Amino acid sequence: MFERIVDGRTDLVFEFLAQGHPANSADDDGVSLIKWCAYYGDVSAIRFLLANGESLESLGENLGLNGAAFHGHWRLCQFLIESGADVNRPLLDTGETPLHAAVCKANRPTYSLVLKVLLANGANPNCVTKASAETSAFMRDARTKAETPLHRAAAFGTEEAIQLLLDAGAKLDAKDMNGDSPLSWASWHLRPDSILRKLCYGGFAIHPGRQATFDHGVGWGALEASLLGTPHV
């Protein structure tokens, strides 16, 4: 039965404990039931384990809030915050906060809900990571760049996610370790003009006639549309 829980049937924790297994049971790799339930965002299963003797601290640093944000589990984020997790606590090795963790995936609407929960509970939109610290947020051979959450949202987030950060006071002119702004990150990642416009600051602007819709290289860009020409028939 544990294998089925590992594969997503976290509802089976009720039956698993009813069979006499302890709430702090773990698989052969030492990953506990509560961590699997957190991985899948099952707050009800977590509450059941807690009621039967498991400890929320076993989820790790800051009650695992960064992980919950990274996986897009807004309900779990809210529960962990209500249980004492700190929305502004950075990871010791990278300086990444839960806000940073919530803007690591491209165009996933669920992360806007996570941002809403974090920001509503006082998350600082202008916190920065450490410089050149190896991060697992992007899985392979990646290092932080002293960036804000808006930098990451500019590269990967939806328009809504970007607007949420801006409304919370995120700085358009924030610079990372290389002197790049969120607009720089959006430009490098080939974001659409609608996003670039949101991120313009100072003397930067996007021509009102530009309506490039490509995102991360997918779709039509302004140059490609222009190169089509206009047939005179």
PLM-predicted stretches and their roles:
Residues 12, 60-64, 110:
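Structural recognition of alpha-solenoid helical scaffolds
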Residues 1, 26-33, 58-66, 90-103, ...:
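Ankyrin-repeat boundary/"N-cap" motif
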Residues 14-22, 47-55, 78-86, 116-124, ...:
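Ankyrin repeat domain, specifically the short helix-to-loop turn at the C-terminus of the second helix
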Residues 3-8, 36-42, 67-73, 101-111, ...:
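Ankyrin repeat A-helix N-terminal signature
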Residues 1-32, 36:
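N-terminal segments that cap or nucleate solenoid repeat domains
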Residues 92, 108, 115, 124, ...:
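Solenoidal tandem-repeat scaffolds enriched in leucines and small polar residues
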Residues 1-3, 121, 168, 187-233:
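Ankyrin-repeat-protein effector appendages
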Residues 143, 147, 151-193, 198, ...:
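Ankyrin-repeat and related helical/solenoid repeat scaffolds used for protein-protein interactions
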